Amino acid sequence: MTVLIHVLGSDIPHHNRTVLRFFNDALAATSEHAREFMVVGKDDGLSDSCPALSVQFFPGKKSLAEAVIAKAKANRQQRFFFHGQFNPKLWLALLSGGIKSRQFFWHIWGADLYELSSGLIYKLFYPLRRLAQKRVGCVFATRGDLSFFAKTHPKVRGELLYFPTRMDPSLNTLANDRQREGKMTILVGNSGDRSNEHVAALRAVHQQFGDTVKVVVPMGYPPNNEAYIEEVRQAGLELFSEENLQVLSEKLEFDAYLALLRQCDLGYFIFARQQGIGTLCLLIQAGIPCVLNRENPFWQDMTEQHLPVLFTTDDLNEDIVREAQRQLASVDKNTIAFFSPNYLQGWQRALAIAAGEVA
């Protein structure tokens, strides 16, 4: 049998590293279909840290896409599992038949599903991508993204799958003993990426709570983002006093980020699509409720797991936040489907489907 090849088609270092390490640590030992990767980006020690994997690195999207297409044409039995994607040439290859539907399996990461960019080149490309998506052999995604995708592509098979967020299950009960009182701390956004709409989010928080809360804005990732960070900082200072605004410009290591999240009382995410599932998982694990945009379909996954959801359109105050915290504390977090290690079963099934081992 031809071994499944996994494709990380865009240079997104943080996400790519997370996926590679997850496969190395949790999947490669038990499945031959979890070991072969083609990745856009630099090695940067990944080969050494993932010895169970065979990883081929490419300098850019174009070179990777050309290599994938060549493999697909040379052997029509070869199957590919595309994680995320963000690679126009691969979509065009699927549309034109360079890659066949039976070869193309896609794990949706959120951004590659939605059509939120206003640039002309994106608006021209989106209809083509939409046509190509009708030809995907099977999509894997969150419950909300599956629902969103099915509205335009009802005939494409969909399977539930969650991004492998790095989590320590032993921390699931840690938050229950913590007493929350005094001035609330609100986390705004999950990174420094503009998709977080930081300025609009800060204004929304201020409209709800005024200058009575402390706001923390993590913006250490992606790098080389100084101008936008300063723009957000200045906008924040127009709304909040200096002691109530903390804009973080340095990238935090995982343990430091975890400690930061656990000092918060609420997460506030204004973006109108599914993203930031890693941060959401870590907040929920710590007993911290989240405010979502109603257009973010991940609320469907949260309600399915009996988790409280607050929306940006709700009238929020401290009492409502504290009640959501109380409800979250009563949830058995060891049963949440998108938590580690529960999402592992979905990955094992996804591998079997993509490799053709199960129908």
Swiss-Prot record:
Origin superkingdom: Bacteria
Location in the cell: Cell inner membrane
GO CC terms: plasma membrane
Membrane topology of this protein: Peripheral membrane protein
Broadest EC class assigned to this enzyme: transferase
Keywords linked to the UniProt accession: Cell inner membrane, Cell membrane, Glycosyltransferase, Membrane, Transferase
Swiss-Prot/TrEMBL catalytic activity: beta-D-ManNAcA-(1->4)-alpha-D-GlcNAc-di-trans,octa-cis-undecaprenyl diphosphate + dTDP-4-acetamido-4,6-dideoxy-alpha-D-galactose = alpha-D-FucNAc4-(1->4)-beta-D-ManNAcA-(1->4)-D-GlcNAc-undecaprenyl diphosphate + dTDP + H(+)
Keyword Membrane found: yes
Pathway: Bacterial outer membrane biogenesis; enterobacterial common antigen biosynthesis
Gene Ontology molecular function terms on file: 4-acetamido-4,6-dideoxy-D-galactose transferase activity; fucosyltransferase activity
EC number per UniProt: 2.4.1.325
Entry keyword Membrane: yes
GO terms, biological process: enterobacterial common antigen biosynthetic process; fucosylation
Purpose of the protein: Catalyzes the synthesis of Und-PP-GlcNAc-ManNAcA-Fuc4NAc (Lipid III), the third lipid-linked intermediate involved in ECA synthesis.
Similarity remark: Belongs to the glycosyltransferase 56 family.
Protein name: TDP-N-acetylfucosamine:lipid II N-acetylfucosaminyltransferase
Gene: wecF
